[in-house]
Amino acid sequence: MRVLGIETSCDETGIAIYDDERGLLANQLYSQVKLHADYGGVVPELASRDHVRKTVPLIQAALKEAGLMASDIDAVAYTAGPGLVGALLVGATVGRSLAFAWNVPAIPVHHMEGHLLAPMLEDNPPDFPFVALLVSGGHTQLISVTGIGQYELLGESIDDAAGEAFDKTAKLLGLDYPGGPMLSKMALQGTAGRFVFPRPMTDRPGLDFSFSGLKTFAANTIRSNGEDEQTRADIARAFEDAVVDTLMIKCKRALESTGFKRLVMAGGVSANQTLRAKLAEMMQKRCGEVFYARPEFCTDNGAMIAYAGMVRFKAGVTADLGVTVRPRWPLAELPAV
C-alpha cells in the first residue's frame, strides 16, 4: 500500500511516497528560504504562489524517484492544517484533485501530528506511551501521547513559540533569515556564563511556556553591551542556553507528572544539537529514552505527511469531496484510531 504525501503549510513544498512494507520510497523537498530572505520572514502570498509553481513538478519527480506511475498510488495525503491558509489550499486542492482523478481516497493530515509521528520513520521508533515536545516556529507544546490520536495537551507557549523567539532574537543580532540555525551556530563561539538570561515560568508550577520576554531581555542586553562579534556570540549563547534549559525543565516536569519513561522531540527546533544533547543527558539520568527524527525530517517535509496519512488511511479516514483546510486546528481534536 502506497501513499503520496503533500506538505505545503508554510514555506517548504514537500512531496513523498511511503510504502507500508518497504518504507519511504521517495522524498522531494523545495525550500523557499531564498524567496523570503529579503523580507526577513515568510510572506504568505509569495509562499502560496511558489507552492503553485513547485507542487506538481515535485510530485512528478517523486514518482520518478520511486519508479512508480500514478496508478501505483493507493491514497493521497495532504496537510490540511494548521498553517498559512493560502499555502494550505494549494496542497489541499492539488491533493484532492489528484485523488479524484486517480480514483483513490484523499487523506487530510494534521501538520503537527505529522511532526509528532516523524520519529516513527526511524529504525528505532518509540513505543506508546510517551511525552512529546513539539517545538517549532509556530508551536511549543507538551503532549501526553498514549496512542494515535490519543493526545492530551499538557502545556504550551502563551506567547511566542521557541522557534519564533530564536528567529526574532537572531534578527536583533543582525543575522539573516532564517536566523534560528545561524544563532545556534554563533552560540558555539560564545562564552558560557558571561550573560545569564532568565528561564521563563520555571519558578512557578505548571507546564506552560513563555518566550517573548527573552527577546526583550536580549534586546536590552545588546543595547547595554555593544555589538562586537564576541559580545553577540556570548548573547547568542546565553539566549540558547535559556531556551534549552527552559524546555528541559518543563519536559522533566511533564515526565514526572505522567510517569512516562519515553520522550519524543519533534518539530524544526528539535534539530538543535544543544537541545538534543541536554535532553539525552537528562533522559539517561532518568533511565529513560529520548527519540527524534533525523534533521531533514525535523523541519517541514512530505515524508511525515505520507506516513501520518498512511496511519490514518489504514484507520479508514478519508476526506469529503470538497476542499477544506484549517489554519488553526488543535491537535487534541483529532480522533483516536
From Swiss-Prot:
Identification of the protein by name: tRNA N6-adenosine threonylcarbamoyltransferase
Primary location: cytoplasm
Substrates-to-products reaction catalysed: L-threonylcarbamoyladenylate + adenosine(37) in tRNA = N(6)-L-threonylcarbamoyladenosine(37) in tRNA + AMP + H(+)
MF (Gene Ontology): iron ion binding; N(6)-L-threonylcarbamoyladenine synthase activity
Database matches in InterPro entries: ATPase_NBD, Gcp-like_dom, KAE1/TsaD, Peptidase_M22_CS, TsaD
Co-factor(s): Fe(2+)
Family matches, as NCBIfam families: gcp_kae1, T6A_TsaD_YgjD
E.C. number(s) listed in UniProt: 2.3.1.234
Swiss-Prot/TrEMBL keywords: Acyltransferase, Cytoplasm, Iron, Metal-binding, Transferase, tRNA processing
A Gene Ontology biological process term: tRNA threonylcarbamoyladenosine modification
Note on cofactor: Binds 1 Fe(2+) ion per subunit.
Originating gene: tsaD
One GO CC annotation: cytoplasm
HAMAP family: TsaD
Functional summary from the UniProt entry: Required for the formation of a threonylcarbamoyl group on adenosine at position 37 (t(6)A37) in tRNAs that read codons beginning with adenine. Is involved in the transfer of the threonylcarbamoyl moiety of threonylcarbamoyl-AMP (TC-AMP) to the N6 group of A37, together with TsaE and TsaB. TsaD likely plays a direct catalytic role in this reaction.
Cellular localisation: Cytoplasm
Sites where the protein binds Fe cation: H111, H115, D300
Classification lineage: Bacteria, Pseudomonadati, Pseudomonadota, Gammaproteobacteria, Enterobacterales
Family of this protein: Belongs to the KAE1 / TsaD family.
Organism listed in the record: Salmonella arizonae (strain ATCC BAA-731 / CDC346-86 / RSK2980)
Residues that, per the record, bind substrate: L134, V135, S136, G137, G138, D167, G180, N272
Pfam families xrefs: TsaD
